[in-house]
Each structure stands twice: as C-alpha cells, then as structure tokens.
C-alpha cells in the first residue's frame, strides 16, 4: 500500500492517486464536543508540505465517497484504503467514546451513504493515544445501533503513538479488538528514525500468536529509506511522494517480491509467503 500522506483537501485526492497512491491518510480534528470537525493538520507538519489545507470533515467524506464509488465520474479504482489520523489530543480521555460514536455517524451518513452503495474503500481508524481505546468501542456501538454492524467489516485500527508493542496489544484487548490491526511506526520526514520498532512489529505480525496484521512506516520520501523499509518487510509506506515509492517498487530487486495492492487484497489478512 502506497499511502499518500496528509491528504486533507478534496483536490488532493486526485493529485496523490495520480502520483501512484492506492491509499491516503487524512487528518481529522475534533471540536470541544468531540464532533469530527475538519480535515486539517496545522503547523508544524512535514518539511516541504503546506500544513494548512482543509475541508469540513463531512464535505471531505462526500468527496472521498465519489472517489471510491464505482460509476462515479470522480471514481479511482485503485484507491482502496483510507487512514483517518484522528487528532484526539484536543479531547479529554473521557470523550473518546463519544468521538467514536460521532465519527461513525458522520461516516455512515456521508461516506457509506447509510449503507446504500456508499464508498467502498477500507477504513483505518488511527488513534494516537492508547488511553483513547474507547473510541473504537464507541464507533462500533454507534454502527450497531444505527443498524449497520456489517460495515465494521470495512474498518481496521491503528495506534500511532510508537508505544511499546505489548502496551498496544493490551489496549486492543481492552477494546475487544481481535483483528483488522495495522501497526504504524514512524516520525516526521524532518527527522530520522531507525527501523528497530518496525522490525519488532513485523516479527509480531509474522509470529503465530501476534496481534498485528499489517505494518506501515511513515513518512518516507527518499529512495534509500524506501528500500530499507521494504527490506524490513513492511506492508505499507506512507509518503509525501507516491511516485518515489512506485519507482522503487519497479526496481528489479523489489519487482518480483512486492506489488501494489488492489481492492481484492484484504487489508485485514496477514500476508503469508
């Protein structure tokens, strides 16, 4: 999965997919009542990027729905996964469940079209704080009470705080999560970060009793760091330059071993060689 980083304006969906992304990451900010409000990152952000592009969250979802609904004039067949980077740092811990419920209702109405031929992309809820695990239970409760528990089949999870892998496993246990787990590791492109924790996550993914299904690394903009991440065995790379990742995947060393994921590749299934 080539994951376009910080895609917060509707116009950027086309831009990143046309550069080779089959997945995008979108920032979600919340108001003081735990309603998802804007797709917005703000300053500071990655080096070389404009930090302030934004849409109202529900408007972004409508644009995203068009981009992922077969038959729509804006449809991109290859856009198959969306990571919502949930900026819950502005919330109190006891608002996490409400944030999950409100997020689910927004998605149900504006992205999934109330279960009636909505957008088809898989969705990852990426949460920066392990203490906010109730966002997951709230999300699930809302979809169930709205009569669409089947949409949970399209939803996965990530805790993005680079926490100890044992602590992450524990948070999932508390949230009742037993699958659909993506594990991120990374740092802003302005700084360097080694691959030690990525290798631990990959080892967990590949062990018989691990909780992780997929591992992705962020934010990778250079060819050599792309090669290093692929050599470590990641499933996804988040980038500001999807064309760079696509170029490396075309190199002879990687062409035989990796391919770009399509809609038929289940993102919740651990890949077995």
Swiss-Prot record:
Pfam families: GDPD_2
Active site positions: 5, 41
Tissue-level expression: Expressed by the venom gland.
The enzyme's E.C. designation: 4.6.1.-
Cofactors named for this entry: Mg(2+)
GO BP annotations listed: killing of cells of another organism; lipid catabolic process
Alphabetical keyword list: Cytolysis, Dermonecrotic toxin, Disulfide bond, Glycoprotein, Hemolysis, Lipid degradation, Lipid metabolism, Lyase, Magnesium, Metal-binding, Secreted, Toxin
Primary localisation category: secreted
Entry's family note: Belongs to the arthropod phospholipase D family. Class II subfamily.
Name by which UniProt lists this protein: Dermonecrotic toxin LapSicTox-alphaIB1c
């Amino acid at each position: 999965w080539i994951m376009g980083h910080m895609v917060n304006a509707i116009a950027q969906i086309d831009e990143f997919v046309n550069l080779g992304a089959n997945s995008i990451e979108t920032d979600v900010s919340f108001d003081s009542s735990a309603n998802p409000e804007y797709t917005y990152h703000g300053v500071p952000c990655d080096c070389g990027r404009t930090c302030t592009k934004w849409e109202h969250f529900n408007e972004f979802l409508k644009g995203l729905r068009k981009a992922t609904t077969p038959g729509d004039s804006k449809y991109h067949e290859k856009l198959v996964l969306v990571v919502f980077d949930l900026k819950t740092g502005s919330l109190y811990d006891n608002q996490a469940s409400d944030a999950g419920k409100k997020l689910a209702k927004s998605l149900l109405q504006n992205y999934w079209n109330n279960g009636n031929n909505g957008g088809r992309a898989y969705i990852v809820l990426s949460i920066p704080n392990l203490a906010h695990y109730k966002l997951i239970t709230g999300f699930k409760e809302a979809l169930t009470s709205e009569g669409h528990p089947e949409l949970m089949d399209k939803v996965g999870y990530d805790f993005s705080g680079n926490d100890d892998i044992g602590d992450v496993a524990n948070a999932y246990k508390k949230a009742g999560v037993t699958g659909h787990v993506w594990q991120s590791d990374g740092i802003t492109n302005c700084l360097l970060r080694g691959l030690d924790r990525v290798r631990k996550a990959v080892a967990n993914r590949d062990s018989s009793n691990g909780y992780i299904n997929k591992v992705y690394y962020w934010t990778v903009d250079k060819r050599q760091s792309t090669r290093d991440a692929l050599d470590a065995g990641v499933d996804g790379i988040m980038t500001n330059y999807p064309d760079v990742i696509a170029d490396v995947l075309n190199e002879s060393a990687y062409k035989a071993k990796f391919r770009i994921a399509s809609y038929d590749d289940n993102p919740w299934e651990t890949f077995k060689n």
